[in-house]
Amino acid sequence: VKGDVVTLISENSPRWLIADQGLMRLGAINAVRGINSPSVELEYIIEHSNSVGLIVQSKEVWLKLNKKNELKKRFKFIINLEDEQFEDLINWPEFIKAGEENLLKNNSFEKYNHQINDIASILYTSGTTGKPKGVPLTHANFLHQIINLAHIADPEPGTSVLSVLPIWHSYERSAEYFFFSCGCTQFY
């Protein structure tokens, strides 16, 4: 739903990018972080961002977060980016199947009329000087980066690029969006 926040905790992968872009297409805001962050930091991000949904890289990330077995009730949904079925998390094949069924039923995907200044994502600092700070980024922020990266690089469609920085880092994300918009092949 437009404006809902979904926390996305994962490392670099094609499924991260698919989840990220799917959330943006729906008008949702994603709060992103990597799996190696301390659980207290991840819990803070979930709480601070008022997340209504959660997407995790694996069951191990979910177990790390849900030590007290209290998180499940706060979310409308929890998606596991892996194929493995675990508890009542929605695994990747189930998520894809639900999307396909919805498309067949409605003959279209739900669309969101994006506004340039709508918040697209909340990036959190590492919290080295205290609690992590949430930095809201708009679609305009990302577009500015994509446009300006074109002054630095001019790849041909099909060019192979390697993702090395954490995908939830602002520069890596901007670079991925830029290379994606150029038709490059992304490797993780």
Model regions and ranges:
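Conserved S/T- and glycine-rich ATP-binding loop of Class I adenylate-forming
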Residues: 6, 23, 54, 119, ...
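Conserved AMP-binding A3 loop
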Residues: 120-144
